[in-house]
């Protein structure tokens, strides 16, 4: 269904409620440049990494899995026996995910706050456009928990909206991104209303800050797999 959520001002902070879940797939496709390409790229690197896994049934977590799009891609790309656990604290989102993946018996979803649970040892984690919504003081805690739960040679995918450390470049990047959204059919008002709703909810870091954060929790190998203006996909490997 087409995203018309911000035709008018919400009058409240953005949250992942039933109204958002109803249009979320369209919102993702029209708001994140090269969204599907990043999903496929991330799935490829996880699939390649799993070839080195000694676990007969590797476990993969998707934290903030929303409507389950990444698991749809993973199930298509990975041929070996795997277990997928998607975690999100929005039940409306998970209902969409469960419907999409109901035929995949290897895929399970949990409606919990992933900041408050312990993870099993896993071969891979994904945080796709999620870290930016977590309070800055909690990001390092979460990433350290993920690092400690990753098996040796396991990987973490991080997709993020980012900012430039240069004020002028950051302004230009934002302007280009708004032009992109206009070309996707969003009006000036919709862009402005969404920006207002996301203020202090979505807090982006720079590319350098995100890489430094990953390195600070123990990752020695962090690479940018993809970057378009103010969006990036990172992979970090535990060695």
From Swiss-Prot:
Name the record gives this protein: Carboxy-S-adenosyl-L-methionine synthase
Molecular function (Gene Ontology), one example: carboxyl- or carbamoyltransferase activity
InterPro entries in alphabetical order: CmoA, Methyltransf_25, SAM-dependent_MTases_sf
Gene3D superfamilies according to UniProt: Vaccinia Virus protein VP39 (3.40.50.150)
Organism classification: Bacteria, Pseudomonadati, Campylobacterota, Epsilonproteobacteria, Campylobacterales
The species this protein was found in: Helicobacter acinonychis (strain Sheeba)
Function of the protein: Catalyzes the conversion of S-adenosyl-L-methionine (SAM) to carboxy-S-adenosyl-L-methionine (Cx-SAM).
Keyword Transferase: yes
Subunit structure: Homodimer.
Pfam families on file: Methyltransf_25
Any GO BP: tRNA wobble uridine modification
Domain of life: Bacteria
Family: Belongs to the class I-like SAM-binding methyltransferase superfamily. Cx-SAM synthase family.
Swiss-Prot/TrEMBL keywords: S-adenosyl-L-methionine, Transferase
EC number: 2.1.3.-
